Every structure is written in C-alpha cells, then in structure tokens.
Amino acid sequence: MLVIAIGGNTSSRTALKLRDYLTEYFSREPSMLIIPTATSDPANFSEIQSFWAKIFKDVCLLPLHKKVNSFLSEEELHNKLQNYDFVFFSGGDQKRIIQLIRGHSIHRFLLEKNSSSLFAVGGTSAGAAALGDLCILSGSPARFESIKITSGLGLLKGYVVDQHFKERKRFGRLIYVVLKWKINGVGIDEDTAAIFRSDGELLKILGSGFAWFFEYDKDGRLGLCYKKEAEGEV
C-alpha cells in the first residue's frame, strides 16, 4: 500500500504530478474517493471535490461528517470503498478524523489494505497529520506544554507527520514530539507530497517544497535530513 502525505495548499501542478505518479504505479489512472471528515463546514464539500475532479477522471466524495448523515450501511460503505484505488482525507481539523474514523469500519478496511500493493491512501494538511502512528492534534511550537498528541490511524508505520511545516515554523514542535515519544517524524512543507510504502520506506517527493525527516535512534540521538522532488539530500 502507498501512503501519501501532503503538507497542505496543493497546487494543480503538484496534484497533476501526483496523478502521473499514481498512474504509472497502477498502470492506469486510479479512481479517487475523498473523505472530507476534517473540514469544519460541509459547504466546503463541493469545492474539495471540484479541485480533485480537475485532476482525476473518476472522483467521488463520501459525505462522512458529524454534521451530515451519509445514509450508508456498513455493507454499503465497505462495497463503496472496494470500488476505489485511492482513498484521500482532505484538510481541516485532524481531531475530527481521529474521532470519526479511528476504529470505524473505514479504518479497519484501510488497515486490511496494508498488504495490498495496488492501493493508495493519502491526506493533505489535517488528513496527512492523521496518517501516522501518532497524531499531533494541536500545539504551539513556542509552548511545548500546549502540544496535544493522540494515536493516529497507523497507516504510515513508525512515523508522526506534521504539515504546513516550514510555513508555520513547526520545527521545534516536531523535534519535541520525536524526542519525547521516541518516534521518527516527517515535516512536510505546503504544496509538497511525500510518498511512502506503509512500512515507512520513502519512495518519492513531489512538489515545490521539502520533506524534513527527524530520525530517532535507540540511544536517544536525533538525525535530520531533508529532501526535495529530485530526491537530493542535504
């Protein structure tokens, strides 16, 4: 399974690069199912779907939100998920994803897909933050005591993901989480996608920014590297 974490504010150019990468991976253009649980207002659904419908030919939005009744049974929901290659969590507040998705049948379905080679799951902004073993719910980089952590969806093994990384100066926040919780971290800039295998192996960086990797070793030491689209390392 591929796991795709995007740092937010995705441009059409980067979205098209992602489509091309996935098309090569699947040997055809994949179908996309958007889960907009994180958004604050269901009125945003049409805008979210409209953006991605300009990128992929087959795009569906599943109106799973605490303010909306989707009227789908567990069986209907499972059948719908089976029909799509790429499940994608849009942005907003990651707490909503954790509360509505973690432990839900959708979550179980995605975990079962972990060993499937021809499947992808991803998210942008809050959707990316929810993908790892841990999820940063909130917290200021200037006040570490304000940082709130919970279990993530566990789709990207061994990682905690932070987003809008360079733009919101979240270096200190992520380093604090990595050292305190003894986990690897990746911070992803806006308009940047990091593509992994579900076991944490990095495959590709796409977009205009960097993905910043903070590796925690068993001796409590922290290693840092950062990568751009060309996969160059500094």
Predicted feature descriptions by range:
Residues 1-86, 90:
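N-terminal beta1-alpha1 cap of cysteine-dependent amidohydrolase-like domains
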Residues 1-28, 39-46, 137-234:
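C-terminal and late-domain segments of enzyme folds
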Residues 9, 92-94, 127:
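Short glycine-rich anion-binding loops that position phosphate/pyrophosphate groups of nucleotides
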Residues 32, 87, 125, 161, ...:
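A residue-level signal for conserved active-site and pocket-lining positions in enzyme catalytic cores
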Residues 45, 71-74, 97-101, 133:
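Short, conserved acidic/polar surface loops in the N-terminal third of protein domains
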Residues 76-78, 84-86, 94-118, 226-234:
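Mature, structured domains of secreted/extracytosolic soluble proteins
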Residues 96-100, 107-168:
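Class I SAM-dependent methyltransferase SAM-binding "motif I" and its flanking Rossmann-like core
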